[in-house]
């Protein structure tokens, strides 16, 4: 009997979600076959480590079943029901609400198959979503969220229990891949002699707040022209952010290298990691920076406080002036001391053990 991990797609925009599912599935009982279905395309390497990965290459119209495509829903449900039976599925790990809308209808006639839906971020629940999720018993369907903050929010909306699966990276595995500072800077093309290097990692989308960060960073260059900001990631806002860099005269002071495949190994290139997000379900960047020993400036979101507590250095969400002041003030702080406090607060080793135990419980259906 196997576990089927169902995700929407592969590719760099989904990298953090793939990491979380990989970490969860790594805690499955030894010998349990794990198969991954990507509803659309691409197969990330981290999921291949767990077992067979299949890209189903289904169209969005077929999957979403809107308009005239609603007529195809019975066939879609039949397709997935047969596929689950063929693969002797015992459990289905479902990536968020979008995939749940596709998969759960097929499980109505398969009461022996358990489903675990993992919520990675805030989502707009429609009335039909609530009805769908309430059709299943607690024995067949488990709802999980990657942080306590997110679990509380979704549970309040659904009026259903949501298990907190506080996602945590394996600190030992992550630390082994980290490059030394000089080597990491060389790979990123950082000029020698740069006074301070600030790093930000994430998709180039509105919720990440990089537009606010650019405006704030520009203000700090008046007194510290030898600073550098690198924003690693790709997304729909690239053209807008590039135009902002040009308008603010930040050419050469801000680098937008796009998606970098080995970004997890490069954190020690930074003096500080900046996380100006407007909203986050978890924020794996927090964990990656802490394990790398790099101090963090982050938006004052509850999900970041959940991880860093009083050791966090927080800045008001979307407040350009506050971000400029915080970046300016960072020069007077001991990065070693700040990083040590944040590491002690997150306590990656014990957080990883708690996460492993929680995953084992969820996957076993206890």
Which residues are covered by each model-predicted region?
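A conserved mid-protein helix/loop that constitutes part of the nucleotide-sugar donor-binding site
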Residues: 15-23, 196, 200-219, 236-242
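Short His-centered aromatic/hydrophobic patch
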Residues: 94-101
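A short helix/loop element that forms part of the nucleotide-sugar donor recognition site in Leloir-type
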Residues: 175-191
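Aromatic "clamp/platform" in nucleotide-sugar-dependent glycosyltransferases that forms part
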Residues: 259, 278
């Amino acid at each position: 009997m196997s576990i089927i991990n169902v995700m929407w797609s592969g590719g760099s925009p989904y990298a953090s979600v793939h990491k979380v599912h990989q970490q969860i599935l790594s805690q499955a009982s030894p010998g349990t076959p794990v198969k991954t279905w990507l509803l659309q395309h691409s197969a990330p390497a981290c999921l291949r480590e767990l077992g067979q990965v299949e890209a189903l290459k289904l169209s969005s119209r077929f999957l979403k079943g809107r308009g005239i495509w609603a007529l195809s829903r019975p066939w879609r449900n039949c397709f997935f029901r047969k596929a689950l039976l063929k693969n002797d599925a015992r459990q289905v790990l479902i990536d968020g609400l979008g995939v749940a809308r596709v998969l759960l209808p097929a499980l109505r006639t398969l009461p022996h198959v358990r489903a675990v839906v993992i919520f990675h971020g805030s989502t707009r629940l429609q009335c039909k979503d609530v009805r769908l999720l309430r059709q299943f018993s607690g024995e067949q369907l488990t709802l999980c969220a990657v942080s306590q903050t997110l679990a509380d929010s979704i549970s309040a909306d659904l009026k259903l229990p949501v298990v907190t699966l506080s996602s945590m990276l394996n600190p030992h595995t992550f630390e082994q891949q980290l490059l030394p500072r000089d080597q990491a800077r060389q790979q990123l093309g950082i000029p020698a002699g740069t006074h301070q290097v600030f790093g930000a990692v994430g998709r180039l989308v509105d919720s990440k707040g990089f537009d606010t960060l650019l405006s704030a960073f520009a203000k700090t260059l008046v007194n510290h022209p030898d600073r550098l900001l690198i924003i690693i990631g790709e997304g729909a806002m690239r053209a807008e952010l590039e135009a902002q860099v040009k308008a603010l005269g930040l050419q050469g002071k801000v680098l937008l290298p796009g998606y970098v495949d080995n970004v997890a190994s490069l954190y020690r290139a930074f003096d500080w990691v900046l996380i100006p997000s407007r909203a986050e379900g978890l924020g794996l960047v927090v964990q990656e920076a802490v394990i790398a020993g790099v101090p963090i400036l982050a938006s004052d979101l509850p999900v970041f406080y959940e991880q860093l507590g009083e050791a966090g250095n927080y800045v008001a969400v979307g407040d350009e002036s506050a971000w400029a002041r915080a970046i300016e003030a960072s020069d007077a702080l001991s990065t070693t001391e700040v990083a040590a406090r944040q590491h002690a607060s997150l306590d990656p080793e014990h957080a990883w053990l708690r996460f492993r135990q929680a995953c084992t419980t969820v996957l076993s259906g206890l």
